Design a protein with these regions (language model features):
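DUTPase catalytic domain/fold
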Residues: 1-148
Length: 148
């Protein structure tokens, strides 16, 4: 079967329950879950592991969005507002393309995320290329690895 787009576990995780799913038939987002118990001190930003990687077509991207309940119920926000997972992040030699959520604790108390809690939503989308685009770089990492 040809793979078009989807999720796989990173090799260091075996809990199939971590594979994202949509909760309703009309939901755009796949819920990504916490793969390891994670404590976030007040005011800190922590990379929360999801245990998954995503594959997609060359003209697609995966966006990570905060869950609307995070600020109100947990005191957490996805600090970069929208996470952008490029197709060439999949299979990244540094971490297999493991998706992390950059979460900030906006409370004055430690927030603990337990394994299996839903943390962010992931939405696949197409993207367009501008005229004259000549991008030919090769990904070597994640979280700003292609920046200068």
């Amino acid at each position: 079967m040809t793979k078009i787009r989807g999720f796989e576990l990173v090799s260091s995780y075996t809990n199939q329950d971590l594979l994202p799913k949509r909760e309703t038939a009309h939901a755009a987002g796949y819920d990504l879950k916490v793969a390891e118990r994670t404590a976030i001190p007040p005011g800190d930003i922590v990379l929360v592991p999801t245990g998954v990687k995503a594959y997609m077509q060359p003209t697609e991207v995966l966006y990570l969005y905060d869950r609307s309940s995070n600020p109100r119920k947990k005191g957490l926000v996805l600090i970069n507002s929208v996470g952008v997972i490029d197709g060439d992040y999949y299979g990244n030699p540094g971490n297999e393309g493991h998706i992390f959520a950059q979460m900030k604790n906006i409370t004055d108390q430690e927030v603990v995320l337990e394994v299996g809690e839903r943390v962010v939503q992931a939405v696949f989308a197409p993207f367009l290329i501008a005229d004259g685009d000549e991008a030919d770089g090769v990904r070597t990492g994640g979280f700003g690895s292609t920046g200068h």
